[in-house]
């Protein structure tokens, strides 16, 4: 049965689960990175490495979720003008404002070289160096701009043979890319200089393709009951593999973890599978969590943009002191407060902006009405 437009906009889907879990997990990555800046955190580097590896799936999951939800909610396909205008307001405007907030209010969180000239300032806005997490925006917006390509793939991959070819060709190409990255970049001095490779959309194309194919075969996938079992096995192996790689370098540096490494790719796919299996189970039961997941997914991107801003304030106010004394409780409290306030502030800002728009619109309508009456 085809979904109505209202149903497509209101029902939680697998994409919502992927986006909500990715946003929730990614906030922990920055918290753990800050924890390692303390002596107490370095003393607990092994559990921190395990925790970090367990939540290192967020960017692939978010891309997969975006593509799944977009494929589901863009039937019939909207005009490019309509789609890009909608994405500009939903993604572009929040990205612009939060990037400016980081550069102007918290310039200390800039990555690599801080901006000292106008040209460098503009470059920091574009390349994702304005804050530790904004590299993802640079990559994700490329995926969004390429949506016409993904629509063409959806229209083309309508048979089993074509979907099989799409998955196999993507897998082989990406495997060769991983080998080249590991051999020519990761294990060399180029790794630090070539950090912009993480911001190129090509490295995340497989997850976009996965989201498209997952949408196309969803009626069959939603019948699977044991998807979580192999995902748990492969995910456990991949986490251990990542931790082994991280702990080879002392002191522990989480920057050494790259989404382009085989262990990280295996874990990202396993984590996506686990989240999909949870979504299947809850969708089948019509869980009461569906509206909650949909709400979280709606505000996930904007909360993600804001999280480092609030975490920096929390860390400066009392987080560092608490984590230096009780690293576990300190990092947990910083994470919970960051998560709660990121979503709360995002929602309050949304309500405020909606109220302001209503006031402005009413004022304009009243002025137009008065002008028409006077004429």
Protein language model features and the residues they cover:
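C-terminal "closing" transmembrane helix and its immediate cytosolic amphipathic cap
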Residues: 2-3, 280-297, 308-375
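Membrane-interface helix-boundary motifs at transmembrane edges
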Residues: 8-12, 74-85, 152-165, 216-228, ...
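Functionally critical transmembrane alpha-helices in membrane proteins and complexes, commonly lining
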Residues: 13-73, 91-99
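Juxtamembrane "helix-exit" motif on the non-cytosolic side of transmembrane helices
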Residues: 34-40, 108, 112, 180-191, ...
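Interfacial loop-to-helix transition and helix-capping segments at the boundaries
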Residues: 48-59, 125-139, 184-207, 243-273
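Transmembrane alpha-helical segments and their boundary/interface "anchor" motifs
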Residues: 52-61, 72-106, 114-132, 143, ...
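Hydrophobic alpha-helical segments with transmembrane-like composition
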Residues: 102-111, 115-186, 198-203, 208
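Alpha-helical transmembrane segments and terminal signal-anchor/GPI-anchor hydrophobic tails
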Residues: 219-299, 309
């Amino acid at each position: 049965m085809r979904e109505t437009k209202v149903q497509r906009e209101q029902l939680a889907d697998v994409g919502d689960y992927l986006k909500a879990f990715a946003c929730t997990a990614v906030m922990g990555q920055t918290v753990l990175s800050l924890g390692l800046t303390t002596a107490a955190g370095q003393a607990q580097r092994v559990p921190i490495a395990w925790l970090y590896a367990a939540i290192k799936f967020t960017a692939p999951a978010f891309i997969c979720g975006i593509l799944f939800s977009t494929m589901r909610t863009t039937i019939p396909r909207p005009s490019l003008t309509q789609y890009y205008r909608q994405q500009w307001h939903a993604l572009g405007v929040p990205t612009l404002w939060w990037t400016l907030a980081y550069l102007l209010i918290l310039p200390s969180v800039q990555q690599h070289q801080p901006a000292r000239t106008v040209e460098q300032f503009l470059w920091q806005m574009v390349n994702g160096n304005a804050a530790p997490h904004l590299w993802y925006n640079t990559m994700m917006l490329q995926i969004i701009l390429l949506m016409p390509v993904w629509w063409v793939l959806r229209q083309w991959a309508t048979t089993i043979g074509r979907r099989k070819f799409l998955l196999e060709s993507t897998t082989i190409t990406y495997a060769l890319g991983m080998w080249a990255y590991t051999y020519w970049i990761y294990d060399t001095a180029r790794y630090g200089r070539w950090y912009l490779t993480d911001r190129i959309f090509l490295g995340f194309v497989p997850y976009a393709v996965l989201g498209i194919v997952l949408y196309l075969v969803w009626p069959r996938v939603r019948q699977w009951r044991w998807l979580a079992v192999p995902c748990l096995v492969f995910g456990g192996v991949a986490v251990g593999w990542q931790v082994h790689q991280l702990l080879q370098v002392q002191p522990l540096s989480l920057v050494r973890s790259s989404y382009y490494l085989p262990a990280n790719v295996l874990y990202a796919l396993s984590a996506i599978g686990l989240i999909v299996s949870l979504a299947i189970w809850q969708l089948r039961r019509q869980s009461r969590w569906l509206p909650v997941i949909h709400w979280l997914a709606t505000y996930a991107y904007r909360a993600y943009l804001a999280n480092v801003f609030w975490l920096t304030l929390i860390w400066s106010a009392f987080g560092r002191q608490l984590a230096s004394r009780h690293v576990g409780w300190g990092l947990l409290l910083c994470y919970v407060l960051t998560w709660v306030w990121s979503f709360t502030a995002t929602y309050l800002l949304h309500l405020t902006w909606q109220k302001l728009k209503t006031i402005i619109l009413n004022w304009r309508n009243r002025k137009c009405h008065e002008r028409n009456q006077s004429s």
